């Protein structure tokens, strides 16, 4: 029986030029929809239409500045002309839907972008969907009313029937007061502070009365709890994250469906060409990537060198040396992700570069405009890069999906060192694996499942005991592991190629949205 799924997400990264995403959550949403289209599933998606995107990162005098991310949405999206309205703060707000149809291998998925930038609305209401993750509590709740309640209304106006409403994170939880049909919920937040909560006073003021009357809550409305209470199926995004979520929300059944990435999107051309030539059907069945074991080592090595050259051309100055070991680190710049951990002992880093005839590190990542600590970390990365003599550090300004593909494929090692317990899943290491790039990471999120020591990558701080100085222990471990890794890379080429193959055959073949979607089909949309 065909199942109609409507997938709601505050951000969706379907293509780099459609600027309705900020990072991992949006790209995961896009990858999920691509997998649905590849399998010809009846999926529809709903998000907001951010005319000013997230923001454009500009580096001036060693500091991050933000500019609007204006983009030509009117050329990229189709104006459906279909409208609905929702009450926000006592006012009727008009919403129009724009559409983008993503063509997959065996079907297409329609994505609807909700826009309040209409002449019928006041100037303040026009701005409600203008930019992603901006404004205070009031603006955030207004966006969530538009996404959840407005989105459910829009689907009715469009004549789209839905069996399952899938809420990708709690932002769309208010759809539970509007939409009929089964609800599915995926939480991505591993720490209590990350869950959206709104005061009773604000909720009573902002929400439409008929929807408000369906809510039963105390002094504040927790969107994660609202979604959990109204869903037939809920899940976290890795085994560990599901455990943490069950501890945070006792009394709720929370399953684990570990995230994945869309294999065809995240395999750079030298690797996708290699797979096309040797593995029939891998694009719709990436489990077949286990067959990479049968491809000649020299071809895998050649594909990596081509990716490295592409990355060099992609960098503004193009000075990346093909022969030198290169590390990549790119993600949102925020304190728990510790982008400056590798710089804790500059002398140690310099000596590694001396011993192995050079070291290159490529960085990328934006800090949220209101995250002063995150912005400070961007400045610190830039400052440290100037202090090093033997280590060449590159920073990619205004990091995007395009930059991400060049980086995960063009570096030799992917570095990820979040503080433990703060990473729900993480997906950049999965993208790296599709391009034969092993990961060095703290044991957290998906890496607890994906790391086979010395085979697919390495762990940082394995002997860490809670309560100890995490930064000190992890930085010491990081340098020790780099010594081991760089030694293999420079002196044991065959072993290194074996590790590259393992990344593809063991991790890329499993940590993909094809496998992930099949798990949702079996457990959530059944």
State each model region's role.
Residues 1-526:
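Catalytic cores of carbohydrate-active enzymes across secretory and cytosolic contexts
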